[in-house]
Structure formats: structure tokens, C-alpha cells
Amino acid sequence: MRFIIYIGIIFCTAACTSPTPELHPGDLLFRAGRNSAMTGAITAATGRIEAPGFSHVGIFVRYDSTDAVLEAAPEGGVRISPLREFLDGSARIGGRPAAVAMRLRDTAGLAASLRRAFGFLGLPYDCSFRPDNGKLYCSELVWESYRTPDGRRRFPARPMNFRAADGSMPAFWTELFERLGEAIPEGEPGTNPNDMAHDPQLYEVGRWF
């Protein structure tokens, strides 16, 4: 009886533990953020019915022979973060990071896209969520970097929505843009992690949960 229980534990552990995905440079890592005002506002405006709702995306790279993520973050702008640090910023599902790795179906031009992304290192984070202002937010970094060999952007920009599902404007956005002295760019072209994660050009290669 004790032997049967032991075998059952082994099989349950094997079945319930999600392995770390095998990552390639250029894979896009999408994560659901931990609870914060900004994460809540992004998810409310861009989330889909299915879980998790992604609020951040970064680019997997190998930097100084270590696994890392090239990302645009409110703290530090466009920077390189250790992969573990990136995953630690995720919400948890079953105690594991709520993060998914996705890969381009067509990788033509990917090396040039990565070089382009590295060229943005040091730019400030784009709290205004507007294009062509010398700043970048997370999915904007991917949008600007990932291009086809003939220079076209791989991912489309769509009219941005900052409103919650009930049509209300979250206080986070109202207060943020009041501090910036800018109008909320509702309806202006832009990107977000949730839309990008559902782009048919990408396929899932693994998840941590």
C-alpha cells in the first residue's frame, strides 16, 4: 500500500510540474503582472476572457552567456534583466510564474530585429504610450524592433483602448495623464501584450505554469 502511494506521488509530481520551456533568442515572453494599479488598469483595458491576462512582454536574449530578457519597464526604461528576475515579477498560477513563451513562425529577419532591439537599450519608458517620442513601452519595443527582411513591422498597431470593459476610465489612467499634462491617447494607434500574444504569427513553445 505504501509503495502504491509512493508511485502515485511520483506520477502526480511529474504530471503537475511544468518544465521550463526551451527558449531561443528572440522568443517573446508574456507575463501576467503581480497586482498593482498599472497592471490592473492594463488588464482591465486589454484583457480577454481567457486567463491569464498579459500585462507585459519582453524579448528573450542570451547576454554575457546568461539567460536574460530585453524589456521596456517603468523602472529603468529599456534594459536587460535576468530571466529569473523577469519571472519573479509575474503573478502566480499554482505557485508558478504566470508566463508564456512564444516564437515567430517565420524567423526571417530575426537576427536584424534583435540587433535593432539592442540598439534601443537605455531609452526611457514611455508613460505616454505614444509613438515616435524617443521613449518605448513594453510592446512598443517589440513593435519597433521586429520587422520583416524588407523593413515592414511584423505586428500591427491598433486603436488603443484605455477603458475598462464597462466603459469606465480607470482612475489610474486619469491620474497618470493629469500628472503628465497630456490627454489620454484613447483611439490612437498602439500595441499591447494581450493582442500581440494572440497574433497568428506567433505560436506557444512553453509556459511556466
Regions found by a protein language model. Give the residues of each.
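Bacterial N-terminal signal peptides
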Residues: I5-A14
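Cysteine-nucleophile amide-bond enzymes
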Residues: C16-F209
